[in-house]
Amino acid sequence: MLTLIVILAVSYLIGSIPTSIIAGKLLRGIDVRDYGSGNAGGTNAFRVLGWKAGLAVTLLDIVKGAVAAISVVVFFEAHPLGAMPDINPVALRLIAGLAAVFGHVFTVFAGFRGGKGVSTAAGMMFGIAPVSTLIVLAVFLLTIFVSRYVSVASIIAAIAFPLVILVRKYLFDLGEGLDYYIRMFNGHVFIHDSLDFHLLIFGMIVAFAIIYTHRANIGRLLSGNENRVTFGRHA
């Protein structure tokens, strides 16, 4: 039980690192939450700080989710603080990733006012199911290209993830997932692309959560006041 608590605590703290706020302070001496949509996420960083800073913030937020879902769990599996919890391995990684997403949305380092959790959730999912996540990433990028709304792309991508898992698992009958050995650095890296049932259920929960955290964006979309992304507007 102690190991599980520590995994959740460490994952939450990793997710709580307010990357966009730090970037705003370092680059322009501002709090990005005082500008644009008022959100401390990658999308608002794109609007307020420019595409370079926005891209860096988004990538770091993705890394937070992946680190929580993979590295934190793997570390404590190798160095447990007592007995490891009797939980399905994929479910344990999902729980750790969720703690990071929760930390991103309710960051202890910035008055519990963080981002919407999309990038951190994407990082978590990539760490557990990389192939499915890459498919969803393609959907996300295509939606941004067509609509120019990051909020729309985020919502559609969130809905697409459990659908991709469902199709790959049952329609293509891939079972619990596939294993890959990728040649890298004069060796081979083992990657497991999970299609575990827990991932499907969790993907549905995350989809509802992403839609909920975008309720203000949905309101602005309906009223025609949502900001569109214009690439290259800032340096």
From Swiss-Prot:
Entry's transmembrane regions: 4-24, 56-76, 90-110, 126-146, 152-172, 191-211
Disulfide bonds listed in the record:
none
How this chain sits in the membrane, per its record, is: Multi-pass membrane protein
InterPro entries noted in UniProt: G3P_acylTferase_PlsY
Q: Pathway involvement? A: Lipid metabolism; phospholipid metabolism
| GO cellular component annotations of the record | plasma membrane
Q: What is its EC number?
A: 2.3.1.275
Reaction(s) the record says it catalyses: an acyl phosphate + sn-glycerol 3-phosphate = a 1-acyl-sn-glycero-3-phosphate + phosphate
Q: Where in the cell is it found?
A: Cell inner membrane
Top-level class of the enzyme under EC nomenclature = transferase
Return one GO MF term.
acyl-phosphate glycerol-3-phosphate acyltransferase activity
Q: Which GO terms describe its biological process?
A: phospholipid biosynthetic process
Sorted keywords for this record are: Cell inner membrane, Cell membrane, Lipid biosynthesis, Lipid metabolism, Membrane, Phospholipid biosynthesis, Phospholipid metabolism, Transferase, Transmembrane, Transmembrane helix
Job of this protein:
Catalyzes the transfer of an acyl group from acyl-phosphate (acyl-PO(4)) to glycerol-3-phosphate (G3P) to form lysophosphatidic acid (LPA). This enzyme utilizes acyl-phosphate as fatty acyl donor, but not acyl-CoA or acyl-ACP.
Q: Its quaternary structure?
A: Probably interacts with PlsX.
Query: NCBIfam families annotated for this entry?
Result: glycerol-3-phosphate 1-O-acyltransferase PlsY (TIGR00023)
User: What is stated as this protein's family in its record?
Assistant: Belongs to the PlsY family.
User: What is the recorded name of this protein?
Assistant: Glycerol-3-phosphate acyltransferase
Organism encoding this protein? Prosthecochloris aestuarii (strain DSM 271 / SK 413)
